């Protein structure tokens, strides 16, 4: 396939059946959003919000874009802004993985960190301050209708098209901004009303399951953390407040069930998914899958259950997800090394290496002149 821009590659991600982890007789499918160009579902929303703002005239040519992000939205925006020529500033709580900061800066964005104690509400308010102070355009991902609309138009339609005439018994997703939850569930209600919509959230932070309203200010927007929020292991999944988009899904009675997920179980699921099915995804993905597999235990035989896998595992290398992965050889790997006699760290060479001998080398005059011309001004690596 040929594309005229990286932006044309967003969406149309694969739907893949699990072969080992699902219960017998139930079909568990995963929507692998890591196949988006920047590796996450947020690429869809980033492109949609920018293009919607361009059409409405809210975003002017060359204007700086600002957004609060746990990482993936910012990375998607960085791709879009790089291609379209908008400067980007993101605010991010210091608790999110360093990989995300580096990716953002590599893509040309500026990253303003906020104290971890201020949580998601803090980084959002910081972005609002910066937008007001400097006249920047804030995409407002937690309340932007374009966020939900793109999933209504694309993500849900892709899933339904892949199944054709086959029924989808349940669709399972976590929630961050709520855009995926709201957009897909609306489309499912219209086109496949028999599909159960399952929301997954951390068992120690049941901001939906508790049934307690989100504190809101006079403007109706979230005002501070939800009283049932607690820190959890799933970065980018279930923030400390119920967003406007998630609240809309609740108010419209689009969510049929809520499944609570244990953080340790999600971590274990990550390793199982990688080593048994070959998927390399992040904690938000495996937490959602853990919820889907739990729900699948009571699903009827032959049911099709779809779980969203929002991003790639590469965003989590410095997090507890990889805390038990050794950088050095394990005992088993050392034993494998010792099972043959050579190329070992503990082996003494049987004979000394042959001394290097000078050999006449023919000099390429053009190459020599090139090196002479650039060596004072450019880094040159010689092999």
What are these regions (language model features)?
Residues 1-63, 337-338:
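Positively charged, low-complexity intrinsically disordered leader regions
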Residues 9-12, 124, 134-135, 190-283, ...:
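Active-site/ligand-binding loops adjacent to catalytic centers
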Residues 14, 30, 42, 65, ...:
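Buried hydrophobic positions in well-ordered alpha/beta secondary-structure cores of metabolic enzymes
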Residues 51-58, 75-87, 105-106, 185-192, ...:
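Alpha-helix C-terminal capping segments
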Residues 57-94, 167-180, 284-285, 306-309:
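A short, small-residue-rich loop immediately preceding and capping a beta-strand
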Residues 64, 73-130, 207-222, 244-249, ...:
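Active-site-proximal loop->helix
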Residues 134-178, 183-188, 247-260, 264-278:
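Active-site/ligand-binding-proximal alpha/beta "capping" segment
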Residues 369-383:
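Local sequence-structure signature of Cys/Sec-based thiol-disulfide redox active-site neighborhoods
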């Amino acid at each position: 396939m040929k594309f005229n821009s990286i932006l044309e590659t967003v969406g149309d991600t694969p739907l893949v059946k699990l072969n080992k982890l699902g219960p017998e007789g139930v079909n568990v499918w995963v929507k692998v959003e890591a196949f988006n160009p920047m590796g996450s579902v947020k690429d869809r929303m980033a492109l949609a919000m920018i293009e919607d703002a361009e059409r409405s005239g809210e975003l002017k040519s060359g204007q700086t874009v600002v957004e609060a992000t746990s990482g993936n939205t910012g990375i998607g925006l960085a791709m879009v802004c790089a291609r379209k020529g908008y400067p980007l500033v993101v605010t991010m709580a210091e608790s999110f993985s360093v990989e995300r900061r580096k990716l953002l800066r590599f893509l040309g964005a500026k990253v303003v960190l906020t104290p971890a104690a201020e949580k998601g509400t803090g980084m959002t308010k910081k972005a609002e301050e910066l937008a007001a102070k400097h006249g920047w355009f804030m995409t407002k991902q937690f309340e932007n209708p374009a966020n939900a609309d793109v999933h209504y138009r694309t993500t849900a339609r892709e899933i339904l098209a892949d199944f054709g005439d086959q029924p989808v018994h349940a669709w399972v997703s976590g929630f961050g901004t709520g855009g995926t939850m709201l957009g897909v569930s609306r489309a499912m209600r219209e086109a496949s009303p028999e599909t159960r919509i399952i929301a997954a959230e951390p068992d120690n932070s049941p901001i939906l399951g508790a049934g307690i309203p989100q504190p809101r200010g006079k403007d109706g927007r979230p005002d501070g953390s939800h009283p049932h929020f607690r820190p959890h292991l799933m970065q980018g999944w279930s923030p400390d407040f119920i967003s406007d988009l998630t609240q809309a899904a609740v108010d419209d009675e689009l969510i049929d069930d809520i499944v609570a997920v244990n953080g340790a179980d999600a971590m274990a699921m990550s390793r199982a998914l990688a080593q048994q099915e070959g998927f390399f995804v992040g904690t938000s993905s495996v937490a959602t899958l853990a919820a889907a597999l739990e729900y699948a235990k009571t699903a009827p035989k032959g049911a099709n259950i779809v779980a969203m896998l929002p991003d790639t595992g590469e965003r989590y290398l410095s997090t507890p997800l990889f805390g038990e992965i050794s950088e050095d050889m394990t005992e088993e790997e050392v034993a494998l090394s010792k099972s043959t006699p050579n190329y070992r760290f503990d082996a003494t060479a049987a004979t000394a290496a042959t001394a290097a001998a000078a050999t006449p080398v023919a000099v390429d005059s053009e190459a020599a002149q090139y090196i002479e011309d650039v060596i004072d001004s450019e880094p040159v690596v010689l092999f």
